[in-house]
Amino acid sequence: MSKYILEVCVDSVESAISAYNGGATRIELCSNLVIGGTTPDLELFKTIRNHIQIPINVMIRPRYGDFCYTEYEHEIMCRQVENFKNEGADAVVIGSLNIDGTLNEKQMKELIKEAGQCKITLHRAFDMCKDYFQTMEEAIKLGVDTILTSGGKQNCIVGAETIRNLVEQA
């Protein structure tokens, strides 16, 4: 049997500890999960880091809605990446798009540079891209380690064929 990764999205200390005790091998820390997730509070991260010993990936998303960020929002995101990196985040979960549904390479490069040695996950902004296969290639070239996707569908079961094709191309 192959080893799998069980990543659980959490938004509180209690849910992080429950995920850890339940066998999660890493967590994705967000706030506002009910609206798709936003950047969590730094103090929440620090408290969780003190109570669990598995990798913590941190969502960097300053607001709900689309993934097209203004320069001011991008500036905030860069600072958030720096702060979480400095506090010991294992990965940052990011995604920035252009209005035409393509990856915003300029913003992504800056966020990735700011992340330093942290691993990079491209979040579900990927599902909003106009061409998944081109976006995946761009993400790989940028140094993205992981992509979160439902294959552009409401869930991964429905999007399984697209996900399979993406895995084959990768």
Segments (PLM) and residue ranges:
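Active-site mouth loops of central-metabolism enzymes
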Residues: 2-12, 60-78, 121-132
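Active-site-adjacent beta->alpha loops and helix N-cap segments on the catalytic face
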Residues: 13-17, 33-54, 72-75, 96-116, ...
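Glycine-/Pro-rich loop/turn segments that contact NAD(P) or position catalytic residues
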Residues: 129, 136, 140, 148
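Glycine-rich phosphate-binding active-site loops on the catalytic face of alpha/beta enzymes
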Residues: 25-38, 83-99, 144-157
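Glycine-enriched alpha-helix->loop->beta-strand junction motifs that scaffold or abut catalytic
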Residues: 21-27, 52-55, 88-91, 114-118, ...
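Hydrophobic faces of well-ordered beta-strands that scaffold small-molecule active sites
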Residues: 4-8, 27-29, 48, 56-60, ...
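N-terminal pre-domain/capping segments
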Residues: 1-27, 32-39
